[in-house]
Amino acid sequence: MAAVSVDPQRPLPVLLVSVSLGIYEDEHHRVWIAVNVETSHSSHGNRIETCVTVHLQHMTTLPQEPTPQQPINNNSLPTMWRLESRNTYTGTDGTYWRLLDHSQMGDTVQLTLDIIIGEDD
Protein backbone atom coordinates (compact mmCIF):
# COMPACT_ATOMS: atom_id res chain seq x y z
CA MET A 1 0.00 0.00 0.00
CA ALA A 2 1.38 3.42 -0.95
CA ALA A 3 2.17 5.95 1.74
CA VAL A 4 -0.21 8.88 2.01
CA SER A 5 1.34 12.31 1.65
CA VAL A 6 -0.54 14.77 3.85
CA ASP A 7 0.16 18.46 4.44
CA PRO A 8 -0.60 18.94 8.14
CA GLN A 9 -1.01 22.73 7.75
CA ARG A 10 -4.01 22.30 5.43
CA PRO A 11 -6.89 20.25 6.88
CA LEU A 12 -8.55 17.73 4.61
CA PRO A 13 -11.98 18.75 3.32
CA VAL A 14 -14.68 16.91 5.27
CA LEU A 15 -17.31 17.23 2.52
CA LEU A 16 -16.93 17.63 -1.22
CA VAL A 17 -20.26 18.34 -2.92
CA SER A 18 -20.67 18.44 -6.70
CA VAL A 19 -21.83 21.85 -7.92
CA SER A 20 -21.30 21.02 -11.60
CA LEU A 21 -19.79 18.16 -13.58
CA GLY A 22 -16.25 17.70 -12.19
CA ILE A 23 -16.48 20.74 -9.90
CA TYR A 24 -16.86 20.30 -6.13
CA GLU A 25 -17.23 22.64 -3.18
CA ASP A 26 -16.10 21.81 0.35
CA GLU A 27 -17.62 22.82 3.69
CA HIS A 28 -15.56 26.06 3.64
CA HIS A 29 -16.91 26.99 0.17
CA ARG A 30 -13.54 26.25 -1.43
CA VAL A 31 -13.74 25.04 -5.03
CA TRP A 32 -12.08 21.77 -6.10
CA ILE A 33 -11.77 20.78 -9.76
CA ALA A 34 -11.36 17.19 -10.98
CA VAL A 35 -8.40 17.91 -13.26
CA ASN A 36 -7.69 14.29 -14.16
CA VAL A 37 -9.57 11.00 -13.89
CA GLU A 38 -7.60 7.84 -14.71
CA THR A 39 -9.18 4.42 -15.19
CA SER A 40 -7.24 1.18 -15.48
CA HIS A 41 -8.29 -2.48 -15.65
CA SER A 42 -6.52 -5.66 -14.54
CA SER A 43 -7.54 -9.28 -14.18
CA HIS A 44 -6.69 -11.69 -11.40
CA GLY A 45 -7.94 -15.17 -12.27
CA ASN A 46 -11.72 -14.93 -12.69
CA ARG A 47 -11.79 -11.45 -11.19
CA ILE A 48 -11.57 -8.21 -13.16
CA GLU A 49 -10.60 -5.09 -11.21
CA THR A 50 -11.15 -1.51 -12.27
CA CYS A 51 -9.11 1.20 -10.57
CA VAL A 52 -10.30 4.81 -10.79
CA THR A 53 -7.97 7.57 -9.62
CA VAL A 54 -9.17 11.18 -9.43
CA HIS A 55 -6.89 14.20 -9.03
CA LEU A 56 -8.67 17.19 -7.51
CA GLN A 57 -7.11 20.65 -7.27
CA HIS A 58 -8.26 23.51 -5.08
CA MET A 59 -9.13 26.57 -7.18
CA THR A 60 -9.75 30.06 -5.82
CA THR A 61 -12.32 30.79 -8.56
CA LEU A 62 -14.47 28.71 -10.89
CA PRO A 63 -13.15 28.52 -14.45
CA GLN A 64 -15.37 30.36 -16.93
CA GLU A 65 -14.56 27.91 -19.72
CA PRO A 66 -13.50 24.27 -19.53
CA THR A 67 -9.74 23.90 -19.53
CA PRO A 68 -7.90 21.22 -21.51
CA GLN A 69 -6.92 19.61 -18.18
CA GLN A 70 -10.53 19.00 -17.14
CA PRO A 71 -11.67 15.40 -17.68
CA ILE A 72 -14.18 14.74 -20.41
CA ASN A 73 -16.00 11.90 -18.61
CA ASN A 74 -16.73 12.20 -14.87
CA ASN A 75 -19.56 9.65 -14.78
CA SER A 76 -17.61 7.41 -12.37
CA LEU A 77 -17.40 10.14 -9.71
CA PRO A 78 -19.94 10.43 -6.87
CA THR A 79 -21.98 13.59 -6.38
CA MET A 80 -20.56 13.93 -2.86
CA TRP A 81 -17.64 12.60 -0.83
CA ARG A 82 -17.54 12.57 2.99
CA LEU A 83 -14.33 12.08 4.99
CA GLU A 84 -14.83 8.93 7.09
CA SER A 85 -11.34 8.52 8.53
CA ARG A 86 -7.86 9.94 8.13
CA ASN A 87 -7.43 8.27 4.74
CA THR A 88 -10.91 7.23 3.52
CA TYR A 89 -13.75 9.09 1.83
CA THR A 90 -17.22 7.61 1.28
CA GLY A 91 -19.13 8.49 -1.88
CA THR A 92 -22.88 9.07 -1.98
CA ASP A 93 -23.07 5.88 -4.04
CA GLY A 94 -21.68 3.85 -1.09
CA THR A 95 -18.17 3.53 -2.51
CA TYR A 96 -15.02 3.88 -0.43
CA TRP A 97 -12.24 6.04 -1.85
CA ARG A 98 -8.69 5.84 -0.49
CA LEU A 99 -6.71 9.05 0.03
CA LEU A 100 -3.42 8.81 -1.85
CA ASP A 101 -2.17 12.40 -1.61
CA HIS A 102 -3.02 15.72 0.00
CA SER A 103 -0.28 18.21 -0.69
CA GLN A 104 0.57 21.71 -1.81
CA MET A 105 3.07 22.88 -4.40
CA GLY A 106 3.17 26.66 -4.68
CA ASP A 107 -0.43 27.89 -4.80
CA THR A 108 -1.85 24.54 -5.91
CA VAL A 109 -3.43 22.23 -3.32
CA GLN A 110 -3.99 18.71 -4.62
CA LEU A 111 -6.14 15.87 -3.34
CA THR A 112 -5.78 12.44 -4.97
CA LEU A 113 -8.30 9.65 -4.30
CA ASP A 114 -8.66 6.16 -5.74
CA ILE A 115 -11.06 3.25 -5.68
CA ILE A 116 -10.68 -0.36 -6.78
CA ILE A 117 -13.86 -2.04 -7.99
CA GLY A 118 -13.76 -5.83 -8.36
CA GLU A 119 -16.08 -7.87 -10.56
CA ASP A 120 -16.26 -11.63 -11.11
CA ASP A 121 -16.13 -12.92 -14.69
Swiss-Prot record:
Q: Name one GO molecular function term.
A: protein serine/threonine kinase activator activity
Give the range the annotation lists for the signal sequence: none
Say which domain of life the source belongs to. Answer: Eukaryota
InterPro entries the UniProt entry points to: TCL1_MTCP1, TCL1_MTCP1_sf
Write down a Pfam family by its short name. Answer: TCL1_MTCP1
Q: Which family does it belong to?
A: Belongs to the TCL1 family.
Q: What is this protein called?
A: Protein TCL1B5
